[in-house]
């Protein structure tokens, strides 16, 4: 009975041929090594070019927001608000205000008055690691 042809053996041979073909194709397409790829060199370049690149973004407007505090409320509570209603915020009196650029916390500060208008004095710039820590809360 060992002389009988097994259809599964024929399928395995066909699969082996397909794998061999795929491997040879992969070798032929990946013959160019990564070291041969040409990349533009960083550093040691023209510093004035970098300053010109920065000048391109200097006039892009951003939205600066100063947050006094936040709170959560239900729709029912929202609909009950009238003129004179007081909404309690989570920020404490005297606590630094959050300064956001395009919705991202970048600094903290305190309220000041400048020519009869509100202003904010920056008291602390938030480091990138501190921003990540605050976002994970």
Curated annotation (Swiss-Prot):
A GO molecular-function descriptor: cytoskeletal motor activity
Membrane-protein topology: Peripheral membrane protein
Protein name: Flagellar motor switch protein FliN
Role description: FliN is one of three proteins (FliG, FliN, FliM) that form a switch complex that is proposed to be located at the base of the basal body. This complex interacts with the CheY and CheZ chemotaxis proteins, in addition to contacting components of the motor that determine the direction of flagellar rotation.
GO biological process: bacterial-type flagellum-dependent swimming motility; chemotaxis
UniProt similarity note: Belongs to the FliN/MopA/SpaO family.
NCBIfam families: fliN (TIGR02480)
Any single Pfam family the record assigns to this protein: FliMN_C
Localization, UniProt: Cell inner membrane; Bacterial flagellum basal body
UniProt cross-references to InterPro entries, sorted A to Z: FliN (IPR012826), FliN-like_C (IPR001543), FliN/MopA/SpaO (IPR051469), FliN_N (IPR031576), FliN_T3SS_HrcQb (IPR001172), SpoA-like_sf (IPR036429)
Lineage: Bacteria, Pseudomonadati, Pseudomonadota, Gammaproteobacteria, Enterobacterales
Gene Ontology cellular component list: bacterial-type flagellum; bacterial-type flagellum basal body, C ring; bacterial-type flagellum rotor complex; plasma membrane
Keywords carried by this UniProt record: Bacterial flagellum, Cell inner membrane, Cell membrane, Chemotaxis, Flagellar rotation, Membrane
């Amino acid at each position: 009975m060992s002389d009988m042809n097994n259809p599964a053996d024929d399928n395995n041979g066909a699969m082996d041929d397909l794998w061999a073909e795929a491997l040879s194709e992969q070798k032929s397409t990946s013959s160019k090594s990564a070291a041969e790829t040409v990349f533009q060199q960083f550093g040691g370049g023209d510093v004035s070019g970098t300053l010109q690149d920065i000048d391109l973004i200097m006039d892009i407007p951003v939205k600066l927001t100063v947050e006094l505090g936040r709170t959560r409320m239900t729709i029912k509570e929202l609909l009950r608000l009238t003129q004179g209603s007081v909404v309690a915020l989570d920020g404490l009196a005297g606590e630094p205000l959050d300064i956001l650029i395009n919705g991202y916390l970048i600094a903290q500060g305190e309220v000041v008055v400048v020519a009869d208008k509100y202003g904010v004095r920056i008291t602390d710039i938030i480091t990138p690691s501190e921003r990540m820590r605050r976002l994970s809360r």
